[in-house]
Amino acid sequence: MDTLLNTLLNNPMIFLAGALGGLLGVIVSYRELGKIIRVIRTPTSEIGALPLDEQVEIVGKADSEMIINSPITKKTCILWQVEVSEKRGSGKRSRWVTVYSNTSTKSFDVYDGTGKVQIFPNRLTELILRDDVRESSGVFNSLDEGIQIALKDLGVDTEGFLIFNKNMRVYERYIEQGDQIYVLGKMSSKNGIKLMDGESSPLIISDQSELRVLGRFFWRVVINALLGAVIGIALFLYFTNR
């Protein structure tokens, strides 16, 4: 460990390789950087004072006349998201693969003391939600029976070879009536009704604070930068020691 540390400290080219790799990681994260800039540059506004055809940021209560049920726990809500992943392979070659992912697209309202706006989520909408349900299974431990039935209805098989359980992770997230949410997107109007959708501009919906949303995007950039730095250093050491 000391030898490796001394090598790193005494060879500035290693730092340069790491810096270049980190910079490449940041460049690859240009989408996340764009989101960070959008969040920072867009002030939170009262719904009643929102300008049309501009990027806006709102915080308000979720509401809808059309209540739906989440597919896993059948929770009454106005928006849900489900992700199911399965561990495939073994040892160092094992990896988690998403086998099912879906999001509801029913419209709903967000209101504050000054007005309301109709939200139209779609498949491209970015949801940053807390995990309301987080379950996992392994060879010798099963998912809850109700979750197994729900997954079967969704076309997801929880059993593998010789009826052993698959290694799976199940996440369900939802927004309930009255939950406070954060929305960032472009404001428009149709027949006098204010609305935001993901067609004309990317839509971000979260049940967390603006600061936590920023944190999520920031750490994605940091992770990519660190990975880039590690790869840069590894490539430098590989080619210089051949």
Regions picked out by a protein language model, each given a short descriptive name:
Residues 9-15, 219-224:
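N-terminal Sec-pathway targeting helices
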Residues 13-31, 229-232:
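Alpha-helical membrane-embedded segments
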Residues 34-69:
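OB-fold nucleic-acid-binding modules
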Residues 55-90:
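Juxtamembrane non-transmembrane segments of integral membrane proteins
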Residues 78-184, 188-193, 212-220:
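Charged, low-complexity helical/coil segments in non-catalytic cytosolic or luminal regions
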Residues 199-228:
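Cytosolic-side membrane-insertion boundary helix
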